[in-house]
A protein has these predicted regions:
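Residues within well-formed alpha-helices
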Residues: 94, 168-171, 175
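Surface-exposed loop/turn and secondary-structure junction residues enriched for glycine/proline
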Residues: 4, 34-37, 44, 48, ...
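Residues embedded in well-ordered secondary-structure elements
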Residues: 18, 39, 84, 111-113
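A structural "domain/chain start" motif
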Residues: 27-72, 76-87, 130, 173-174, ...
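Soluble non-cytosolic domains of exported or imported proteins
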Residues: 56-68, 113, 117, 158-171
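Surface-exposed short loop/turn segments
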Residues: 77-78, 88-160
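Bacterial N-terminal signal peptides that target proteins for export
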Residues: 2-18
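Bacterial N-terminal signal peptides
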Residues: 16-28
Length: 184
């Protein structure tokens, strides 16, 4: 009886020891998430100016839509003050909208589009104003947004597309801002 109790205690001790060694190994293996949020941005960068975006597409007004989305994101993010003029800023966000495409995503039984996808490709740069040092940049930042096509109503489809463009610009700004802060 004593031998069975001794074996159980030894087995428990072995499991505990194995668990502690495993925990120690995992904690000490150097595994960690890359990019630490705001720590990637120099503390001296407190104000940001969102420069006018360049629009190389045939879609009128995209530059204003995306610039406004980035301005809203800087205000929502809370990490930076929004500078009213370039000269007042520590850093600048610039954007260059390279392309905007619309493609059919799904079809109705009558072979008409039921849903369409907007795809944008743009260059986004976050740089120090004075030194022009690039803090973060993605030359081919791409994002998609979907919207339903209302059969028989061009006006309803246009409203859906406009709403999808607004959502797409906000999603792009949010994602790019997050990547800027994390250093990815």
């Amino acid at each position: 009886m004593k031998e069975a109790s001794y074996t159980k205690k030894r087995c428990r001790l072995g499991r505990l020891l194995f668990g502690l060694i495993l925990l120690w190994f995992i904690a000490g293996c150097g595994y960690h998430v890359v990019g630490g949020g705001e720590d990637n941005i120099a503390p001296g960068i407190q104000s940001v100016f969102v420069d006018s975006f360049i629009n190389k597409t045939s879609e009128a007004g995209l530059e204003s839509l995306f610039r406004n989305a980035f301005i809203d994101q800087v205000l929502r993010g809370g990490r930076f003050q929004l500078a009213g003029r370039r000269e007042e800023a520590d850093a600048i966000i610039r954007g260059n909208i390279k392309s905007m495409n619309t493609s059919h995503l799904s079809y109705q039984a009558t072979d008409l589009a039921a849903e369409e996808r907007l795809s944008v490709v743009m260059e986004v740069t976050f740089e120090e104003r004075v030194s022009k040092k690039v803090i973060w940049q993605d030359r081919n930042f791409s994002y998609n947004g979907d919207y339903p096509v209302t059969s028989g109503s061009l006006t309803a489809t246009q409203v859906e597309r406009k709403d999808a463009l607004t959502k797409l610009s906000n999603d792009v700004a949010e994602r790019a801002y997050s990547l800027m802060l994390s250093g990815f």
